Amino acid sequence: MKLHIYEHCPFCVRALMIFGLKKLPVEVSVIMEGDAETPTRMVGRKVVPILEKEDGTYMPESMDIVRYVDGLAAPRVADAPIDDAVKQWCESVSGPLFNLVIPRFTEGDFAEMATPEARRAYTAREEKAFGDLDALRARTPALLEQVNAKLAALEPLVAGRHAVDTTDFILFPLLRSLTIVKGAAFGPQAQAYLARVSAQTQVALLSDQAK
């Protein structure tokens, strides 16, 4: 099987997580930013991740990929409902979190932005979605205050999380994205959670790029 991704993309992280967790072999292929032709040829639209299955067919949608791969090797890990409290936390933090993360993603060390043209394409895409990225960067102190308050509230929610389940495919990609932000105040429970899930799924954090 072959998994087509962007390295920065939190939805792609979900697909990478299930392969790492199941210890199943997969070839990872990075689609360049600005390349709409490749994903459109595969699934009819510009989207990632895309799983290229052994029979030559293609599967988009991150959680569909998670559930498909989950069924290839026991035990199943992604068949339980998502924890409501964690889901609500993710929804409440996503706005300020991505306002912090996106400007840093545009400057990040990711294979899909390895050429100047690809980086320009990604930056233009995010400016269309988020507006002036310099203005967003200038809001960092206020955004960090909001996100760090949310991180404090997350501590009891992750304290009891040990085995990876469906909820972690929602929570971990968000928190992994946030590790690119210098000053994000992960509490001890969140730090332990990130380290554990990163190790179990073989998905690296972005802490070494934090700015």
Each model region followed by its residue ranges:
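Charge-dense, extended regions
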Residues: 203, 207-211
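GST-like fold's C-terminal all-alpha helical module
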Residues: 93-195
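Short, flexible loop segments at boundaries between secondary-structure elements
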Residues: 196-204
